Amino acid sequence: MAYFDNAATTYPKPECVYQTMDEFYRNTGGSAGRGNHSFSMATSNLVAETRKKIQELLHCPAKQVVFEPTATIALNIIIQGVVENGARNIYISPFEHNAVTRTLSGIAKKASLNIIELTVDSSLHYDLEQIRYQFESVPPDFVIVSHASNVMGLIAPVKDIFILAKKYKAVTLVDMAQTAGLVDCNLGLEVFDFAAFAGHKTMLGPTGISGFVMKPDIDLPPILFGGTGTESANQDMPLSLPERYEMGTLNTVGISGLYASINWILAHGVDTLFREEHEKRSMLLSLLQEYDFIKIVGNRAGDDFVGIVSCLIQGISSESAGEIFSSNNIAVRTGLQCAPAAHRFLKTFPAGTIRFSVNAFTSNADFDVLREALEFISDNL
């Protein structure tokens, strides 16, 4: 399989991820915080060490790491909690995933929300002066920004946006599903209140383990409830972190894989991995641009992109193109990629695009297979 679907989930994983998960399940496999026996204690230590690794990776030793099964659940916990605390003027980027927009839409059926899109100009630059004016006109309570679009890879200047937002004491949330472990971001800065991450994407870990980073002095009302292994006589969720938001048994085998992947990333270097991915993105763009029947969507010069490219093929729907690529043993993602707002901005709604996404593991052999498929399409248009 020539794999160009890394924005959905990265593949392959570093070999150490497979080995660590196998070893964990065969030799430990305990439940964290659920006993004093050696298996449980060893697993609890692993969970604690993985939190420290995430703090190291994201430069936030003073902030709390909370594990969840998915980034979508993490975003729900944060967004629903912040709104319950009173946020009403909510700014989002034009490129948010349904994990954000559907959550806000669901809340808006029960609460009066003023949802405003941050200004991005036609050349795909966040207009900071216009955003400053937006905030002056309607002061923000809550600002949510996808660090990189999962449709075309544009990286947002989140620090600059959040500096503006903090003048109004807004709560800030960055969705790092497409960037954690790939784009260096100092979450230790005061402007970052919350950040969601997806372990199975740019963090190169397994599916089923994600979470968020938060300032420890912010209290969100929990939206999910259950056992935590602590304060079991108390029928309210504990006030202590991270237990307040970690209900049920943690995916400890997933955490073991994430621990291994983060160690691998730290050893190789975040900047090195980004540079390698950017080189692969340039190779992908060069290949696609050889064919005049392909239209690249949402691209411009600059290095503020992760390894995602969206395109259209003249005369072929994105769905049909996906079937052609699949029949040629190529993995891509077609349609709206769970981000209809981005496609409305790019004027590719409702059909969507063909999305290719590369990373450091994308090989020359993958590009050779893709070229053969593009030649097939060229010969049969």
Model regions: which residues?
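Pyridoxal 5′-phosphate
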Residues: 1-381
